[in-house]
Amino acid sequence: MKVSEFDYELPSELIAQEPVEPRDASRLMVLHRKTQRIEHRIFREIIEYLEPGDLLVLNVSKVIPARLYARKKTGASIEILLIERLEEGIWKCLVRPGQKVKKGTELVIDEDLSAVCLGRGEDGTRILKFQPQDDRLIFEKGRTPLPPYIKNEVPLERYQTVYAKEEGSVAAPTAGLHFTPELIEKLKKKGVQFAEVVLHVGIGTFRPVKVEEVEKHKMHEEFYQVTKETIKKLRETRERGNRIVAVGTTTVRTLETIARLPEQEEYVGKTDLFIYPPFEFKLVDALITNFHLPRSTLLMLVAAFAGKDFVMEAYREAVKRRYRFFSFGDAMLIL
């Protein structure tokens, strides 16, 4: 399958530069897979599509302030993006411009914090040892790691879901950005159940698909965790005959990863599961997601879930109706 089959025309003004206020006022496109029908709603109206006993599964990973600005002793500016914590104060990072950072290169963030490059990691990353080796201090100096297509500065808390709690992501699981505490409360009152997973969004988010054929793309591993409590809720939902509704593609990848492993009480590990058409979904019955970049692995996952032709038609419709796209954009519910 060609990556070009997942391309579409997107006018740049439809790339959302800031989030909607309140969060649940964003638009919601509803895709009905059985009837191939499309509806246009507001996100807070999602409550009408969820039944008592349905299970909403949230990724509670929290975005870290992963972007740092440093200088070499020569005065050259270097941008650092924290990717993965290896141990306290030692991080796998992306650095720009990369050719200027070699083993032994010293980087000064400010008078309180510096770093030295210990060497190269895979896929162009660098291993940086910070001085002092204090993650709290590193985070104090860091800024929101917004994607490159967002030109505005946005405070970190607004690039965070209201339920985020496990630090580790370098990009937000954006489908969850539309939920407010009030909407969650209303859903609970209706009898909708909630469960949590963790998947720390990593370097894969920043890496475009560079191959021509979908099958040749390799996903980067990302850390995930599913607790005993969540496993119990998933099992009970299945037994009741209710739906498991994944909030975001990261939740889908976590659930479909554990669905392919031997049964356990709880799961923790790394996943490089790449979901593209055709794919047999074993746990996820419905999906809440945003509108994704052309040719991206996220769009391929959505196409695998709802059917490629239907999804590409929905995206053309979204462009025509001036939906807002990407991280701070509008949402889609696939039933």
From Swiss-Prot:
Catalytic activity, EC: 2.4.99.17
Location(s) in or outside the cell: Cytoplasm
Pfam family, any one: Queuosine_synth
A GO term for molecular function: S-adenosylmethionine:tRNA ribosyltransferase-isomerase activity
GO annotation (BP), single: queuosine biosynthetic process
Any one cellular-component term (Gene Ontology): cytoplasm
Gene3D superfamilies cross-referenced by the UniProt entry: QueA-like
Keywords annotated in UniProt: Cytoplasm, Queuosine biosynthesis, S-adenosyl-L-methionine, Transferase
Catalytic activity: 7-aminomethyl-7-carbaguanosine(34) in tRNA + S-adenosyl-L-methionine = epoxyqueuosine(34) in tRNA + adenine + L-methionine + 2 H(+)
Pathway involvement of the protein, from the record: tRNA modification; tRNA-queuosine biosynthesis
Function summary: Transfers and isomerizes the ribose moiety from AdoMet to the 7-aminomethyl group of 7-deazaguanine (preQ1-tRNA) to give epoxyqueuosine (oQ-tRNA).
Quaternary organization: Monomer.
PANTHER family membership: S-ADENOSYLMETHIONINE:TRNA RIBOSYLTRANSFERASE-ISOMERASE (PTHR30307:SF0)
Similarity section: Belongs to the QueA family.
Name of the protein: S-adenosylmethionine:tRNA ribosyltransferase-isomerase
Organism: Thermotoga petrophila (strain ATCC BAA-488 / DSM 13995 / JCM 10881 / RKU-1)
